[in-house]
Amino acid sequence: PKEVGRLLQSIKELDCEVRRVIVVASGQDISDVIMKFAEYIPVEYYSSEPGQIRQRNKGIALLDKSTRLVATMDDDAVFHKDAVSEMIKFWNNVETETAGVGFNIVNINGHKHNWFRGLLGISAPEPGKVLKSGNTTSICNVKESIRCEWLNGGGTVWRQEILKKYPHDEIKSGWAVCEDIIFSYPKSKKYILYVCQNSKIEVEAVVIMSE
C-alpha cells in the first residue's frame, strides 16, 4: 500500500493530466489507499489473482479504443513531475513503427562496459542490448534517448494496439527481467523501441537488469 500510494501521489503532482489510471492489485484490499486519490486523479481500482502478468493483462482488457498509449507501471515507481509530458513530447516525434518507449530510471546506475566483460559475452558497448548469452545491457539512467532491444515491463509506454495484438502470456519465472525480455525483445525485431532520456522515474527495487 505504501508503494502504490507514492506512485499515485507522483501522478497527482504531474505537470499534465492523465486520462485514466487503472490499479490492479492482488492479495490485501487496498481500495482505501487508492480511492482517496479519486478526488484528484481519474483512478480506478480492481483486484485479480496474484501475478504481475495477470494484473497487467486485466488492466489492458479494461481499455477502450480511445486510449492510444498505455503506460504499464510497477507499484514502486515514482514519476518526476515532467515525466509524462516529456514522454508525450517524445511520442509525438517518433516513427510510426515505434511500439514502446521506456521511462528513464534515474536512481539506478546506468550501463558500464569493459573489454573483459565483452570478451566473456556478458556485455556490449551499447546500452539496451540483448546478448547471445542471454545477458542484457542496462536501460537505466541513460544520458541520451536510445533505441533499444528490450524494455522494462514496469516502466514503459506501449501503443495499445501492440498490447492487444501480442498478449503477454504467463510464464514461470521468478525473475521479472526474464519476463520483460521474453515480451519485449521479439518486438524489437519487428518494431522500434526506445528509452526516453528526459522522461524520468525512480524505483524502489534494486535489481532491474542483469548487469
Language-model features and meaning:
Residues G153, G174-I182:
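Acidic donor-binding loop at a coil-to-helix junction in glycosyltransferase catalytic cores
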